[in-house]
Amino acid sequence: SCHWCHVMEEESFENDSIAKIMNDSFINIKVDREERPDVDKVYMNAVQLMTGKGGWPLNCIALPDGKPVFGGTYFTKEQWSKILKDVSKLYKENPQKVEEYAQRVTEGIQTSELITLNKEEAVFKNEEIIAAINLSTEQLDTINGGFKGAPKFPMPNTLDYLLRYQYHFNKPELFKYIKKSLTKMAYGGIYDQIGGGFSRYSVDNRWHIPHFEKMLYDNAQLVSVYSKAYLQDKNELYKSIVKETLAFVNDELNANNGAFYSSLDADSKNENNELEEGIFYTWTKQELKALIKDYKLFANYYNVNTTGFWENDLYVLIRDQSVTEFAKKNKLTKDELK
């Protein structure tokens, strides 16, 4: 369901010339990380050791014994072609050098797994909890919520931890930050303002343009965080987000056999029946004017303007004020606005 996975598949793996290079010099194995998370973990660790970062699509070149020698995420067709040729040539001309490097990477992976979980029960001391919080607070984005920088992930587990911490230690300033984070995410393009549910992350630092893939595990965890926040704050926005997100999961991810689908694709078909990133979630002004009776009010509420603009005349809906604030400003009741 990842956009860049589709791009690399179309550009490289479905390209005859690239396929010939791969088939002539390599045995190609495609791993479903949902089915084999253990295999995914090994090669993700390897790529992180080699490059300092990871992600998907995850591409790894390994020796016949499975030891990784090269890896990365997305590569253009030209980059991937050169990588394949260079690695193949190096292995033919200097296999010992490649094998030595593979051994070092493998040892690095093994070293990273030397730390084992403590299975003995332990009681955390307040000092330990406070120290953990102090490490994370330096990265808090007090303007846009979430954590500093981009891309911006919701990080539901961290928000849940901070929510518990502020409740037990009575930290009003931290609670203010948490509420800002939850509100900004709910107002942002990372949240589907029409259909409910959260995308995986935003590519900018203000939660506007999402990576349009929607993950089951993200939405499940965010439902939990917003529910707990509502218990503490009784903010109707949080309650609405929980209801809308659960409705999205039930409508779009329910497999009707007792299970749920793990994700929704970032790409959907456009008017030419071609897959395009985010086209299902983005709008032109012309489309909205044809659909919305009171377009001007709608456009003001969802910032169909320079604030909400993405690219190619497309807009990602984003809010910047509450229902109450907007209704009052436009001399409407909340029911009239809805």
Question: What spans do the regions from the language model cover?
Answer:
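Replace the tail clause
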Residues: S1-K338
